[in-house]
Structure formats: structure tokens, C-alpha cells
Amino acid sequence: MKDVVLVKSLYRNTSEYSDKKVKISGWIRTLRASNAFGFIEVNDGSFFKNVQVVFDSAKISNYKEISKLPISSSISVIGTLVETPDSKQPFEIQAEEIIVEGMSDSDYPLQKKRHTFEYLRTIAHLRPRSNAFSATFRVRSVAAYAIHKFFQDQGFVYTHTPILTGSDCEGAGEMFRVTTLDMMAPPISEEGGIDFSQDFFGKETNLTVSGQLNAECFALAFRNIYTFGPTFRAENSNTVKHAAEFWMIEPEMAFADLIDDMEVAENMLKYVIKYVMDECPEEIAFFNQFVDKGLLERLNHVVNSEFGKVTYTEAVKLLQESGKEFEYPVEWGIDLQTEHERYLTEQIFKKPVFVTDYPKDIKAFYMRLNEDGKTVAAMDCLVPGIGEIIGGSQREERLDVLKARMAELNLNEEDYWWYLELRKYGETVHSGFGLGFERLIMYITGMANIRDVIPFPRTTGTAEF
């Protein structure tokens, strides 16, 4: 009886353990007891559902102690697994011995009642023990594995790009500065500014906003690569969709144009969603019942739809001709807002859709300029219920065009010398995209706030835990 059985194994292979003695270890979720017998729901973290343990005063020598245990106390239970086909739970464990591993204080905040997500954010160190967050973070784990599996199975090389960087991939300047200088008395340059040449790295350094530029270096050596790591944006955006620290998946593919880029993005999205649905049916059922009642239908729709395609110019025309009054008026040259994206995917196409060929003035410098000189070979993948979930492009491989674009945006070539040099040594057509991992988890779970799909959220004014 030394071997502890995981609760997940009991649920997945119930018949194998039926009428046999098993040992489980976990935490008490609920406990109710009379003078003669009691019931404990135990969760060991391996599975979404709890196990019901029945304990009898005639069999359990420490019955009185067990019957008064507070919620969240940790215990080990030895007993016989008995199938209960006529009950809500498929089986129960009839206890023969219960060992107290660790007591919980009676002021444990997660008692058996409904708690708001706002309250649970204040106890982020404990919220993984709640049903909603147990489900969320298990889905997050499985989705992360599915992403790696999708790319590894197709021969992509997993590449670690730096978190500390001296360049701004997006050219937006919304970056967190990293320094070891004394901010009370920083060294001053001849021009009167801070002298970053005396800093740790000898230059101004920041937390990365994207690994894409570094990833392109590896794509032009390994052909197909992907990154999956943390990124940081110093955007003062206190919204349900923005966080200062989040995770990004960024594949880059050599010898691939925008059409290839969209094909990989569509296949990846479908694969990951289906993988999570197959591996986490209990969690998805929970979200569908308690968080987003249309979730299952929407996920199945995405998995089984052929994604639509429309150019930005066509999309603007469709929106203008729809007769719908938008909060933000639609005109050519604006960046599409969430309301526009959702209308396209929910009302016009009624399925996921790629919007391509955006105006160059609202997109990044590295995107390939189209023949019209006004648009770039960019794509955004829009999905029902959320809008944009993926953004990507064919990269500008022509050195002269790339330099001209950087000059337009007043970007310093010296900061990107190594990126420009890629265009000198065997450049080729190449493409890639970025997927915000938290936004994907929000979509798969139906959770409405990015703060609730990342373990310890970092947002404007918040860096607790």
C-alpha cells in the first residue's frame, strides 16, 4: 500500500481498481459527518473532479479527529474503491484508514461557496485550489503542451529568444527599461541625457516585446522555427485584454509566403483547440456550464470550419455597407477595432476569418510592402467571440525597401544592423505570426479577463505575489 494512486487514474481506469484497496493523498474540499459516519470530498490536483470518501466510526480509529478536520487539510486515505453506478459519482472509496498529513487553519478563505473572480485575484496564491482556476490552469498546461506538440511533429525547431534586448521589434517604444544605474544619481552624457554607456550592458536595454526579429535569424538557418516565451509591454491599458507580462508563440518559416503563413496559423489553432477538448472534457464541460454557455458550440465551430479570407479594403467596404452603427466609425486607414472584428466574424462570415493586406501606416516596419505601395502583406486571424487572436505577415526580404520603410518611421539602422544583414546573405521569402497565449486560453475557456488565465497577473499598478 505504499504506492499512491492518482485520482485521474481512478477516473480513467475505474474498472481496474474496482473492489480493490487503493491509497490516495490530497486535500479536503468538503466534509460532513454525523456521530456514525461521514463523507469527505478529496482532490489530489491530478484531476478536475473530487473523490468521495465514506468513513465509518466503526472502522476509523481516529473518527472524531477526522470528522472535525477543517477544509483544505491534507490527508491520505486507504480504502476499497466501490463502483456506484446509481449515484452522481461513478465510484467512492470506503475508508479503512485516514492519516492526517497537514492541518489547515479554520480561517481558510476558500470555503464551500461561490467567490467572485475579483476576490480570487486578491488571493492568487490560493485560487488554483478553486474549481474555476483549477480548470483554467490545467487547460493552460495542456494547451502549452499541444502547441509544442503541433510544431515538433512538423519538424519546427524550438528557439529560445532573449528576454533582455537592445531593440524594439514593434517600433512602438512601449518597453520596460532594465538598468543597474543608480536612478538617484545616474551618469549624464555630454548631451545632457542619461549615459547608458556606463550601464551594465553598455547601452539602453529593455524587456522584450517580441522575439520575432531574433526568430527570423534562426528561420534563415533551420527553415521552420518557433518561440514560446514571456513578453512585456509597458502599455498603460487597464482593460480585460491587456497585461504587462504575457506569453507569446511566434513561428517563423523560410520559403513561406502569406498564404503559407495563414495555413499554418489555421491548422495550429484547430489542432490546439481540439487537443484541449479531447484531453480536458471535464474542464470544458465546466466552462460551458458555468462560465460561457455557448463555449462548446463555438469551439466545435472553429475546429470544423474552413476559415474565411478577406482583404482589409474589402472588409472596410463590407462594414460600411452593413448598415450597422459602430462606436468607432469605419473608414479606410483606421486600425479595425474589436467591434469591427467581431461583426466581421460573427455577423458577416459567421466563422473565423483572415483579414489581409492592411494599410502600411498601421502595421510594423518589417512587413512586406505590396505592389500598390499602400498596403503590406499582413494578416490578422479573427474568431467569433473575441476578434483578433493571431497577427502575422510575410516579412520584407528586400533590403532597399526595408531600409526605406525604417527611414519613414525614423528607426535607427544602427540598432538593427544585424537584422538588416540577414537580407545580404541568402535572403528568401519568409513569414511568421504571433499568438498571444493568454488570449488563446481566454478563448478556449470562455474566461473574460486576462488576469484570470495567467497564474500571477502583472497589470498596470499590480505586481503582487
Swiss-Prot record:
Q: Which reaction does it catalyse?
A: tRNA(Asn) + L-asparagine + ATP = L-asparaginyl-tRNA(Asn) + AMP + diphosphate + H(+)
The EC code for this enzyme is 6.1.1.22
Q: Which Pfam families match?
A: tRNA-synt_2, tRNA_anti-codon
**Is Cytoplasm among this UniProt entry's keywords?**
yes
Instruction: Name the domain of life.
Output: Bacteria
Compartments where located:
Cytoplasm
What keywords is this UniProt entry annotated with?
Aminoacyl-tRNA synthetase, ATP-binding, Cytoplasm, Ligase, Nucleotide-binding, Protein biosynthesis
Does the record's keyword annotation contain Nucleotide-binding?
yes
Q: Which GO terms describe its cellular component?
A: cytoplasm
GO molecular function (one): transferase activity
Q: Which SUPFAM superfamilies match?
A: Class II aaRS and biotin synthetases, Nucleic acid-binding proteins
Gene3D superfamilies to which the protein is assigned, alphabetical: Bira Bifunctional Protein, Domain 2, Nucleic acid-binding proteins
Q: PROSITE patterns of this UniProt entry? A: AA_TRNA_LIGASE_II
Single GO BP term: asparaginyl-tRNA aminoacylation
The entry assigns this protein to a family as follows: Belongs to the class-II aminoacyl-tRNA synthetase family.
Q: Assembly and interactions?
A: Homodimer.
Q: What is this protein called?
A: Asparagine--tRNA ligase
- Organism source for this protein? Clostridium perfringens (strain SM101 / Type A)
